Amino acid sequence: MKICVLFGGPHKNGNTAKLLAKVLDGAKSQGHSVELFHLVDMDIRPCKGCMACKKPKANGCVQKDDMVKIYEPLRQCDLLILASPMYWWNLAGPLKDAVDRFFAMPFAAGREQSIFAGKKLMLVMTSGQAAEHDGREGLELILQKMCQFTGMTWLGTVTAGTNDKSLDEQPQVLEKAYAIGAGL
């Protein structure tokens, strides 16, 4: 299976990165390939809402930034993983900008040939709250709606709360993340 990962966190060695690494280690142990994009290191501008990408004979987004490096891996992947710390009950800004730019691709199942149809979507998320109180329900609902609209299958969220303990102090959470990755 081909896995495309959009990592929106600002810290390459932070809690979200550690949780994601365990999921990906598990996936790689089963022979899955991974392409990881560290969005904070890329020049990805927000969607301008210009609608140029939806005009007849349009060829994607008119903004020629680093998002062009992501479009083809998105087309080719079987699983898309969005990885982010929770910021104000949402994705971190760089990841939200990239997801908004999906608009330039054929995405609406039933209305056009969705490049997302048949793919799977997973969220890997950390927050400063205990996992049972992290408030992710609203974000999960948005991603579930995105799956319905695009023809993707929602796999759920791998999450960890880090309010009182870093992930290094929660080996059981990291073991579970590895097992989830190995089960993909």
Predicted feature descriptions by range:
Residues 156-160:
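Beta-strand-loop-alpha "switch" segments that mediate conformational coupling across diverse proteins
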Residues 94, 107-155:
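Short, glycine-/small-residue-rich phosphate/pyrophosphate-handling segment
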